[in-house]
């Protein structure tokens, strides 16, 4: 009896020490913006299986971060506005990625399902307010509203009007997955049809076959990547079937305006839209338009986006212009070249993608950095020698080798600056030198990664991580 008591006491002391070292970083229950029973149950199911205390702690902190701190669900309107984190605006890209891992849990949680449907409807609404905007205010507040010249007066609902292809891709990706999981086709109503028509019109206009179109972007700034060359139109492109993206998912201006990862993403979501239009809406004409555009862009990618590299062989360029010029790099923000195997799983086995994957994680990529704190891909948005954990997570998502997955997880656990969250970026030699302490997308993405590895039977890999 005495031995049992001592054993229990030692166990309690160990738990107390662990709690002091790894305190709960979530808001108090009454301060959480949205509560999902399914999410809480998933955390309680998975966390005890993680034997590494720091990994368990970070999973508990990160996975619910989007619903804890950024989701504003209005049950009366049925719409959901999602902050990106420390910036109180809704990016179409970020919001679609932030709530993505909750979709698989919503079939048994009606409250969660309604909130997710609200995100989708909100995104469709925002696309139709301004198809060229990347981020929006919570209402017609006129907040932010830089004195940008973009070809039209900025709507007060718009936070920023940077044309990025992925702003149209993420909402369709989310809606399609929601439908796959729930079978709820109510989101594919007249607003959906209007949204697809808007996307098609914007994509075809930005193929630049009939001139430059109505959009340009000029900003008075000391950051070269916050404005476009050639009086806001960007460098010339040859109309070869690809779609112009004036800005990257980092919100930096493109150098050559055919952004290859985003064009691949566009092909994928156009085909998803075509499936819905056929199976749900029975709209053969609109479905055919989506398929035709997808086929055209895909053919152009095969012809213009592949470059022969002296070390890695045939790889995908990051940006091209249709004239034969290409930019050989990768940026951490998704969609990136590295992330194509994550966003479009069918590409993971593509030999050109595999060559590209090796290229981007090497010194041949000007934005690959390696230092005392870790290694990974950054981008010009923050500056040189700065790594984005998003790239490390994309490497883990697309890895098949257990040692590679383990190395990625150990890096992620070592570079939280002791705070239990994933940051936007950190210096390659000092993880305490980081940007954005509250960036919900990266936090929830970390939770998504842990869940994927558990579901893929990689719990032993997670539990082999030694970082404390």
Features from the language model and the residues they span:
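Low-complexity, Ser/Thr/Pro/Gly-enriched N-terminal "stalk/linker" regions
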Residues: 20-93, 118
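Extended, well-ordered alpha-helical scaffold segments
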Residues: 58, 110-126, 185-204, 273, ...
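Solvent-exposed loop and edge beta-strand segments that line ligand/cofactor-binding
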Residues: 22-35, 80-95, 108, 154-166, ...
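C-terminal capping/lid segments that line or modulate ligand- or cofactor-binding pockets
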Residues: 150-156, 161-163, 327-349, 385-468
């Amino acid at each position: 009896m005495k031995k049992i008591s001592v054993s229990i006491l030692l166990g309690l002391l160990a738990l107390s020490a662990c709690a002091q070292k790894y305190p709960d970083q979530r808001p108090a229950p009454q301060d959480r913006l949205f509560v999902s029973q399914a999410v809480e149950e998933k955390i309680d199911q998975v966390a005890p299986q993680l034997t590494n205390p720091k990994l368990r702690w970070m999973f508990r902190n990160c996975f619910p971060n989007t619903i804890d701190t950024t989701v504003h669900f209005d049950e009366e309107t049925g719409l959901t506005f999602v902050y990106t984190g420390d910036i109180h605006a809704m990016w179409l890209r970020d919001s679609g990625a932030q709530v993505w891992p909750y979709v698989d849990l919503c079939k048994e949680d009606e409250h969660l399902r309604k909130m997710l449907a609200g995100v989708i409807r909100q995104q469709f609404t925002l696309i139709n307010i301004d198809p060229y905007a990347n981020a929006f205010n919570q209402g017609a507040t006129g907040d932010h509203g830089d004195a940008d010249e973009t070809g039209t007066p900025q709507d007060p609902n718009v936070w920023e009007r940077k044309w990025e292809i992925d702003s149209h891709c993420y909402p369709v990706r989310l809606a399609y997955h929601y439908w796959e999981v729930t079978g709820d086709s109510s989101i594919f109503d007249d607003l959906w049809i209007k949204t697809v028509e808007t996307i098609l019109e914007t994509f075809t206009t930005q193929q630049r076959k009939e001139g430059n179109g109505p959009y340009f972007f000029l900003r008075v700034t000391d950051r070269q990547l916050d404005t476009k060359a050639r009086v806001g139109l960007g460098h010339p492109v040859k109309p070869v079937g690809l779609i112009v993206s004036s800005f990257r998912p980092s919100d930096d201006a493109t150098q050559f305006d055919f952004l290859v990862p985003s064009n691949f993403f566009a092909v994928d979501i156009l085909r998803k839209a075509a499936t819905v239009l056929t199976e749900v809406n029975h709209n053969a004409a609109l479905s055919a338009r989506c398929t035709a555009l997808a086929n055209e862009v895909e053919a152009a990618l095969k012809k213009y986006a592949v470059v022969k590299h002296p070390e890695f062989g045939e790889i995908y360029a990051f940006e091209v212009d249709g004239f034969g010029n290409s930019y050989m790099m990768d940026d951490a923000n998704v969609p990136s070249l590295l992330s194509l195997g994550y966003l479009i799983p069918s590409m993971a086995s593509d030999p050109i993608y595999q060559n590209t994957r090796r290229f981007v994680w090497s010194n041949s990529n000007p934005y690959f950095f390696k230092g005392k704190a870790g290694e990974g891909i950054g981008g010009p948005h923050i500056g040189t020698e700065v790594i984005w954990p998003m790239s490390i997570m994309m490497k883990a998502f697309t890895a098949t080798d257990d040692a590679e997955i383990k190395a990625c997880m150990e890096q992620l656990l070592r570079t939280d600056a002791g705070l239990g969250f994933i940051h936007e970026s950190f210096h390659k030699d000092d993880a305490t030198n980081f940007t954005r302490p509250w960036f919900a997308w990266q936090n929830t993405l970390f939770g998504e990664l842990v869940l994927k590895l558990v579901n893929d039977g990689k719990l032993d890999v997670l539990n082999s991580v030694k970082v404390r």
